[in-house]
Design a protein with these regions (language model features):
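An N-terminal assembly and electron-transfer interface module characteristic of large anaerobic redox
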Residues: 3, 154, 159-164, 475-482, ...
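Short glycine-rich, Thr/Ser-proximal phosphate-binding strand/loop in the N-terminal lobe
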Residues: 4-39, 43, 150-151, 155, ...
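Glycine-rich phosphate-binding loops at beta-strand->alpha-helix junctions
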Residues: 62-63, 234-263, 274-278, 410-413, ...
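Conserved phosphate-binding catalytic cores of ATP/NTP-utilizing and phosphoryl-transfer enzymes
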Residues: 64-99, 104-150, 230, 234-235, ...
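Glycine-rich phosphate-binding/hydrolytic loop that grips phosphoryl groups
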Residues: 84-87, 162-170, 272-305, 435, ...
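Acidic, glycine/GT-rich loop-and beta-edge segments that sit at the periphery of enzyme/chaperone cores
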Residues: 141, 288-348, 456, 607-680
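Glycine-rich phosphate-binding loop plus the immediately following alpha-helix
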Residues: 147-188, 274-278, 284-288, 376-385, ...
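Adenine-nucleotide phosphate-binding core of ATP-dependent small-molecule kinases
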Residues: 200-231, 519-548
Length: 1024
């Protein structure tokens, strides 16, 4: 019998399908190839050859082209393969669950013994699919099948695909098949970034550390995948009709397809053999009649030439590696066995340091001299509290006489661990790492720490932290990526390290974000690159990411002479060697490189409790009795004390301590500070004032005009309208319109417009506009929306020109195209040119058939400008008042700069409240005197000119420091961030940048801000 054979070689798996003459599946096979594509192909073809000697063959899949070229076999692009399968097979919608165990290579046998369900069910209703949604290991697609084929595919980012689910399962410490089981038990959905899988991971990790339930996290992960697919791929086209779900994640995780159904408000289905549609399409397209055993021999004989750029091997030979190991064994923390220490009754007191990190938890004990007595390094597996509890229980069991006289926590879980176990204090992790490095190398002048999700670089000057570099919201380029890739290879990190060390020609993957290197990795796989060379290339890339993307150095050798590298990632000899080769110098790696945060915390506990008498009568902070009585419980709350409506997890411990997470301010915790001081800090927050000042324009019973002659007209409260609302509201009200302003954004606003977003790369504030339009049309039933295009902003004479950025200026046109059934007024106007402005508006209002005349428009323009100038004057006056009052009360001031629309709570994620809650006054760029300054870039954008002006103002005020909010995806901020940094650094001021996007958890933001404050306070210096 002549059969049709299709191979689908994807990013993580290989699949094979054999069809009979009637296109029925008579054989199928599936397993992970672990990047060994040729070996996997030989394996799977051998199994086929056992049953079928010849057949028509074609190959598809993201990693299949190299093999197709080797065999001179037809390659079918996977989209067309999927389309051919959809067209060539009859699809029946049934309740049958087609389950496949991905961990087994032997597939279930049909009665005919051919390896498949020969008698496929055709019960149920036959359907014609309208849309196919396919999720693979690192690929995602939506095929719109009606009205001609339209395909949407993910780019190089693997966010929202099977590999992301793999990462999340690993992060939660569960098997991937448990995701579905846990998701079905969920009671709460956490808002998680949907733009990118790594961003979602950055949201999830702090939730894991803060004790969120795994069941809720599991479903939240699936929701994030749905959001990524709809927002990132559909890009404004509505998903409707008969939906077919394809690919591994949608096959193996029924809860994922259920989440799609929930969000799309429809009922899709997973067809039989959904996992094999690409392979089936390839089989249908097969044109080469082949002998299978000939193909196997051809693969064995073919060697792939190196077609990629290579780097120097990490180690030329065993001798070089031995010298490397010997050199790095010289710098050590002094150690002593804990049992030996406790055998001397004079040495009962120890100090505990806990580093509750993003993926691991580290604990150390030291004596009063800083000698390391005990250590533990382990994955936190989603429960840091239980990890610490188990460590302490085992400690007391092994050493009943031990007394813990002081304790300190650091890392993501700093506050959680400190409260759970009555520790004396917490310390921001950057400061903890500095303390530890200084203990080993007193003259240290630069520290590089690469952990699971965080990258910290500290510049040390005169014995104190002088500058801080942290990776942004994205955790790519850190240890977690290497860990994930090792998992994909089926090896642990020790084996991964060995593979990289034995590389002879590491592949050059550049210094891009490592998630975006997937395309390069796939290409290397197609070319037959060895796993060793890919592993070594990734080690180089992590190093380059630190040097050129985080530190942003142009000369690696200029960082310093006494460099300490630390963090779990540097436990890898391969990463360390790549760093030394790239730097062209030798560095110091402590023998406890992965424990430096915990060790620094223990040193700080020692300093914090320095007045304790070290004798046998000293009172420990934790006892064995305390641990026996230890318990905690958690509950989910929604805080309604401000517009953020934070989703709170409240954890109460047996020691009467409570821990709140998810809150962006201290309002929910009335006991945190006294009410008078809290009220003062609220008054010293310009962002609170901005929202209150603009609230007078919100649409409500008091602020409506139902008898307006010209009816309702809507304004979206976002982008170019945010600061201009006083003008437009007054202007249109004066023309006798009932002006409806959409409310302040929240998560629901984003979800309302999510399906209309045409690009996943546009900034988050622009994405929110779609939701504001839906609110105006669906909730307020506004018949007309006024959303003008403003090429120019108000001219404040502080720049060479006064443009708005292209998104701010012209997004109204995108909105109009996305909402063809709504009536939009989108005039191109210049608020600086009254004559042309009024004439243009007159022509625009003619579309509404009003009798508004030009003189009325001119009067309304004057009234609007008066209103706008009053608002801007009020902001400046309030800013001056905040600065004056903060100085009177000796409160530090933060200049939190960005764009006017960064005042939106859903955009800034509560960062102003967070800074205020840390005891600082908050002002913004609108609060400072306007002044044109010299810049190193073309200064032609109004919003950006204000940033430069604010930075210059900060350089002239010692008690004010700047923090810049940047929306991810903002192209112009690639320029402004460098210029703002340059202005500040000329005056020896620290620059702090906060990347904000759909991310909702502020754990990383809090660490960055506290690091700034620690450096400013001189909290950690050589004198400590």
């Amino acid at each position: 019998m002549t059969v049709k054979i299709g191979l689908d070689i994807g990013s993580t798996t290989i699949k094979a399908v054999v069809l009979d003459i009637e296109n029925r599946v008579i054989f199928k096979e599936y397993f992970r190839h672990l990047s060994k594509i040729n070996e996997a192909a030989i394996d799977i073809l051998s199994r086929i050859c056992d049953r079928f000697k010849v057949g028509f063959l074609a190959i598809s899949g993201s990693a299949g082209m190299g093999l197709a070229n080797t065999l001179n076999i037809k390659f079918v692009q996977e989209v067309f393969a999927t389309k051919m399968a959809l067209d060539g097979l009859d699809l029946y919608k049934t309740d049958k669950k087609n389950k496949v165990d991905e961990n087994k290579n032997d597939m279930p046998k049909c009665d005919g013994g051919c390896g498949c369900d020969h008698n496929q069910s055709d019960s149920g209703s036959k359907i014609e699919p309208d849309v196919a949604i396919e999720l693979g290991g690192e690929d995602a697609k939506i095929l719109f099948l009606k009205g001609g084929l339209e395909v949407r595919m993910n780019g190089t980012c693997a966010g929202g695909t099977g590999s992301f689910i793999d990462q999340m399962a690993s992060l939660l410490g569960i098997d991937i098949d448990k995701i579905d089981e846990y998701a079905k038990q969920a009671q709460k959905i956490y808002p998680i970034a949907s733009r990118c899988g790594v961003f979602a991971k950055t949201d999830i990790q702090p939730l894991v550390n803060q004790g969120a339930k795994i069941q809720d996290l599991a479903k939240s992960i699936l929701y994030a995948i749905v959001d990524q697919t709809i927002g990132g791929l559909a890009q404004g086209r509505k998903i409707e009709g008969n939906i077919v779900y394809l690919g591994g994640p949608l096959t193996f995780i029924p809860s994922l397809s259920a989440c799609f159904d929930e969000i799309l408000s429809l009922k899709g289905f997973v067809p039989d053999n959904s996992l094999y549609f690409v392979a089936t399409g390839a089989a249908l397209a097969g044109q080469n009649l082949c002998k299978i055993d000939d193909l196997i021999e051809k693969i064995k004989e073919k060697s792939n030439p190196v077609t990629y750029n290579t780097l120097a091997p990490l180690f030329k030979n065993e001798t070089e590696y031995a010298d490397f190991k010997q050199r790095h064994e010289k710098k050590h923390i002094q150690m002593q066995d804990l049992g030996e220490f406790l055998s001397d009754r004079r040495n009962q007191g120890v100090f505990l340091g806990v580093d509750s990190g993003s993926t691991t938890i580290k604990m150390v004990l030291i004596d009063k001299n800083g000698t390391l007595l005990h250590q533990q390094y382990s994955l936190n597996k989603g429960n840091p509290v239980d990890n610490v509890k188990n460590y302490l229980e085992n400690l007391f069991l092994s050493h009943p006489s031990i007394k813990i006289l002081g304790g300190c926590a650091t890392g993501y879980g700093e506050e959680l661990i400190a409260k759970a176990f009555n520790l004396n204090c917490g310390i921001v992790e950057t400061a903890a790492h500095f303390l530890a490095a200084k203990q080993i190398l007193p003259d240290v002048d630069f520290i590089v720490d690469i952990g699971g999700q965080d990258m910290k670089c500290l510049k040390i000057k005169n014995g104190a932290i002088d500058d801080i570099f942290l990776n942004e919201a994205c955790s790519s380029g850190c240890g977690s990526f290497l860990q994930t890739f090792a998992f994909a290879l089926g090896v642990d990190m020790h084996k991964f390290n060995d593979l990289a060390q034995n590389s002879d020609a590491p592949v050059d993957l550049g210094s891009r974000c490592t998630v975006f290197m997937n395309s390069s990795i796939k290409q290397a796989q197609k070319d037959g690159t060895s796993v060793q060379n890919i592993a070594a290339g990734l080690c180089y890339s992590v190093v380059k990411n630190a040097l050129y993307k985080v530190i942003r150095t142009t000369d690696a050798g200029a960082l310093g002479k006494n460099i300490v590298v630390q963090g779990g990632t540097f436990l890898s000899d391969a990463v360390l060697r790549a760093f030394e080769i790239e730097m062209n110098l030798t560095v110091t790696r402590p023998n406890i490189a992965g424990l430096m945060g915990a060790y620094g915390a223990a040193l700080y506990a020692l300093k914090y409790t320095k007045n304790i008498s070290f004798d046998t009568d000293s009172i420990p902070i934790i006892t064995q009795i305390d641990l026996k009585k230890f318990f905690y419980n958690s509950q989910n709350l929604t805080c309604g004390k401000c517009p953020n409506k934070c989703q709170i997890v409240k954890i109460e411990f047996s020691n009467n301590q409570k821990y709140l997470t998810g809150n962006k301010c201290s309002l929910i915790d009335e006991g945190q500070t006294d009410k008078a001081h809290k009220q003062l800090l609220k008054e010293l927050n310009i962002f609170e004032y901005k929202l209150n000042r603009l609230s007078k324009y919100f649409y409500n019973q008091k602020n409506s005009n139902p008898n307006a002659k010209n009816g309702k007209i809507g304004l979206p409260f976002q982008l170019n309208m945010y600061e201009m609302i006083p003008f437009w509201h007054k202007f249109l009200s004066a023309l006798d319109f009932d002006v409806v302003l959409s409310p302040v954004s929240d998560l629901a606003t984003f979800r309302k417009g999510q399906a209309d977003i045409p690009s996943d790369t546009v900034c988050f504030p622009a994405k929110l506009v779609h939701g504001h339009i839906k609110t105006l049309t669906d909730q307020f039933k506004v018949p007309v929306i006024f959303y003008p295009c403003l090429s120019y902003n108000i001219n404040q004479d502080i720049s060479n020109n006064h443009f708005n950025c292209p998104v701010v200026a012209y997004y109204p046109q995108v909105i109009g195209i996305s909402n063809p059934n709504a009536l939009f007024l989108q005039p191109f106007v210049d608020p600086n040119d009254k004559k042309s402005f009024c004439k243009t508006i007159e022509g625009e209002l003619f579309k509404l058939k009003t009798d508004i005349k030009l003189p009325q428009i001119k009067r309304a323009f004057d009234l609007g400008m008066e209103e706008l100038n009053g608002y801007l004057s009020d902001l400046k006056q309030k800013g001056e008042e905040i600065i004056k009052k903060a100085r009177q009360n000796k409160i530090d001031i933060v200049m939190l700069v960005g764009r006017p629309y960064h005042a939106d709570p859903e955009v800034n994620k509560g960062i102003p409240k967070l800074i205020s809650g840390l005891g600082k006054a908050v002002v913004s760029e609108e609060c400072v005197p306007l002044k044109k300054i010299e810049t190193g870039v073309l200064n032609q954008w109004t919003y950006h000119a204000r940033l430069y002006n604010a930075a210059d103002f900060v350089t002239r005020n010692d008690d004010i420091n700047l923090v810049q909010m940047v929306s991810f995806g903002c192209g112009l901020d690639a320029v402004t961030t460098d210029e703002v940094r340059a202005i500040l650094e000329k005056s020896k001021k620290l620059y702090t940048q906060l990347k904000i996007d759909e991310i909702t958890n502020l754990g990383a933001v809090k660490i960055r801000i506290k690091s700034l404050f620690a450096a400013l306070d001189g909290k950690i210096t050589a004198a400590d």
